[in-house]
């Protein structure tokens, strides 16, 4: 990795470890194999006849055949199209059509995989360690109190660390998102858990000098999932964001939004439309910055910049040397 005057290409030379979202459960049919590209590599995701979803590296340990091209799931096993070797739910080879002695180390590289709330997630660790944390748990919200979840999706041509760091960069709210003061961010760190709280004022009209106070709480237990709660005297909103690296400079962002309902459904609809429009506009503003900035390993910070370096230290624990 080339370094010039404190400028580096990446936050890390490795991909982060943790649980990451790959797709909706409904996108993967029974006995189907899909090829996906994440973590700067190709993977396959398949579903057995009993309904179990599994993420695997795609190459057969025999002679390197790619199971994502004409491979087949038959019941609970997956077959390599090259020589017909079969692999069971543990990843080990269970049958060779033309041989009796199975090499004891003939095993596909399965990744820990779960399905939760209609989504398929996998655990990534380039050192191949078992998961040290539980997968993120999404909130189960009462539909009588909260609007139906709205799904938004972006491909951002920027590394994951740049995107998630925005949650603790409070001063940018004044310049990118039109806060009328200079917000401050407080940070609580407990192991792999982080909570960032920010309070900012936004004007609701050109003549409004005082503005409306909006409080934001961002929670995360790893780089792949962020829950944000936004509250003011006019709205309470929740966003749950899944961030999955495609490669070192591209991140898939999937966001699920909801707001707390007003007693009056017409008012709720008006607030929702306004919130959604502004959320998309704000994300696009951030996206432009993320995709055009560079990463500075040793930024020149002032006293008003807040806990950026503390946040980076927290995030670094998910990246192996």
Residue ranges of model-derived segments:
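Non-catalytic accessory segments flanking enzyme active sites
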Residues: 9, 15-16
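A general structural signal for short secondary-structure junctions and capping/turn motifs
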Residues: 11-12, 35, 112-114, 244-245, ...
